[in-house]
Amino acid sequence: MWRLKVGEGKGKDPYLFSSNNFVGRQTWEFDPKAGTREERTAVEEARRSFFDNRSRVKPSSDLLWKMQFLKEAKFEQVIPPVKIDGGEAITYEKATNALRRGVAFLSALQASDGHWPGEFTGPLCMLPPLVFCLYITGHLEEVFDAEHRKEMLRYIYCHQNEDGGWGFHIESKSIMFTTTLNYICLRILGVGPDGGLENACKRARQWILSHGGVIYIPCWGKVWLSVLGIYDWSGVNPMPPEIWLLPYFLPIHLGKAFSYTRITYMPISYLYGKKFVGQITPLIMQLREELHLQPYEEINWNKARHLCAKEDKYYPHPLVQDLIWDALHTFVEPLLASWPINKLVRKKALQVAMKHIHYEDENSHYITIGCIEKNLCMLACWIDNPDGNHFKKHLSRIPDMMWVAEDGMKMQCFGSQLWMTGFAVQALLASDPRDETYDVLRRAHDYIKKSQVRDNPSGDFKSMYRHISKGGWTLSDRDHGWQVSDCTAEAAKCCMLLSTMPTDITGEKINLEQLYDSVNLMLSLQSENGGFTAWEPVRAYKWMELMNPTDLFANAMTEREYTECTSAVLQALVIFNQLYPDHRTKEITKSIEKAVQFIESKQLRDGSWYGSWGICFTYGTWFALCGLAAIGKTYNNCLSMRDGVHFLLNIQNEDGGWGESYMSCPEQRYIPLEGNRSNVVQTAWAMMALIHAGQAKRDLIPLHSAAKFIITSQLENGDFPQQELLGASMSTCMLHYSTYKDIFPPWALAEYRKAAFIHHADL
């Protein structure tokens, strides 16, 4: 059986190091002797059930670690299920029992070091490049044994669409990018060209060829196929490493770009500058024949540079971008690659690119900012020195990126430990914690305190295009190292709220200087327009988006301000101002005022706010209304609050819930779930937004209906059902936060109970 291990790594591997004694580290290990017959049967049943229902519910319920943790906690749900029939009223007792059931279940899922684990996946483009990298470097069987490979195959099979392709993420329609990557991954893992479960490879290849063959794969796919030797580098738009030698004052310098894009193109520029191609094995030769519609030697690679399948093209290249690519390809790259310039300029450029790669790797303990970047950086390190320590350190951190659930083994974006813990703590605090949750809060508080980033990136970090990180919190753990404004805000909120409680309940308060550092970091991420960015201040002009080469994403070139980040920081600063009114008072007051103006300015005509990190208008409106409420805005004194409330009430479903499709994100307009289905987590978001906007004082019926939907959705063990994806990124990339369903419904019930039963009266 697979077992989730927490906080392990000390002394086991000379290439593994930590800034925090591996607190929060999550790794999976296969133990052939683990588990009773009943437990193994339960795991197999979970796998069978997922596969049989995979067309109806795409995300996993993340059952494997939950079964393990519930057993280790000796969890038994002793509070009976709450039944509410037809028009029956909700009583205080029933609301309390449903809440306590959810809190008990959530508490039992806490890890020993205080965090809440959970799957953080969704995109189907993450696992294959890892397999490609290990195949090219000759380490595939060393890193992944037969059990790993079996679960990887399970994951790929589980998420193949009926048409034979794979979507950009697990709920999307098939696209060339992920269909090609997963097809090649299956072949590398040993599946024959017509083999696989339900003829997976044959069906996938038919999809690829019927859509023009792999010359229509978007640019990132072209890079990986060129590295493998299935595509030619002359068919890739140039990304010369000399870009890193340009003066930083130039507005087009990639050092000013969005952090994820910048770090993605560091190794891509290195690979391009080297024109690296792995060993041409018999399998690669077969793939050349299988995936192209014409003989490999006859392909017009120059023409293929601009090709992209219509299914993949979310951001079509403007004409000016294609003209620039053509100029680079026709004139600049041949010059840079010629002697003696290649010995002088290119050699220096490759050294600079590798210097930046090593810097990012070291400062993230080789987790890297995300998995897309890790795979590319790891390969670049191997090319630079196959026997070097940098590559070996990358190998040691691969387990941190892997996750196992009933749908198989997948590669995570990275972890979401801190993000989940911050929300879980707020849910527990809202529930009026009792004796049985005090230890849970104490452990969570300890995890949050230990996970704060205590230093800035090493050395002259500004010359490496990095921002301060001291005082911040990451999405996952301290070792990751990448500060995020909303993660910092949620963690700081928890620390401040817990500091108001007795230390014998919640443990020692966080050091005040650490809170000051977190405030300093948050303030540094506010733009002139009042909004807060996520990772770094805005450095590039918006017109740089004209050079977005990804095809797949929008808003990929520049950092920008987000409603959710702005609201989270606003709420944290309001609490800080109340507790510590003498620290940077004028700056914080001005910051809050500007943040409010930004949130109000981002409201759309229908009263909603676009959510960049969740789906979508429901998520954004929840954050916006909570932020405005934190500063004292009400339905009566704020038009934005009124319009936001009306938007949510107008989209409430007949069953009392809310349900929004992920298509709202790319379409940038509200789209309900098919059949007007409701989603229990989105219902919780909308419900909390209305409560913070004072809905209980005006009309309780919408809240009662929502609460009834949540309560009647609760499962026997106190958990809630897994439904649609809930996370989002860059408009098209949907994310699976599996622990959301364990946190937000109880949190909403806690807020509902306080708002609806002020005097503990029945409805």
UniProtKB/Swiss-Prot annotation:
Keyword presence, Repeat: yes
Keyword line: Isomerase, Repeat
Example GO biological process: triterpenoid biosynthetic process
GO MF assignments: oxidosqualene cyclase activity
GO cellular component: lipid droplet
Ranges of the PFTB repeats in the UniProt entry: 149-190, 515-556, 592-632, 641-682, 703-744
Pfam families linked to this entry: SQHop_cyclase_C (PF13243), SQHop_cyclase_N (PF13249)
EC number, as in UniProt: 5.4.99.-
Cross-referenced Gene3D superfamilies: 1.50.10.20
Family, as annotated: Belongs to the terpene cyclase/mutase family.
Protein name: Lupeol synthase 5
High-level lineage: Eukaryota, Viridiplantae, Streptophyta, Embryophyta, Tracheophyta
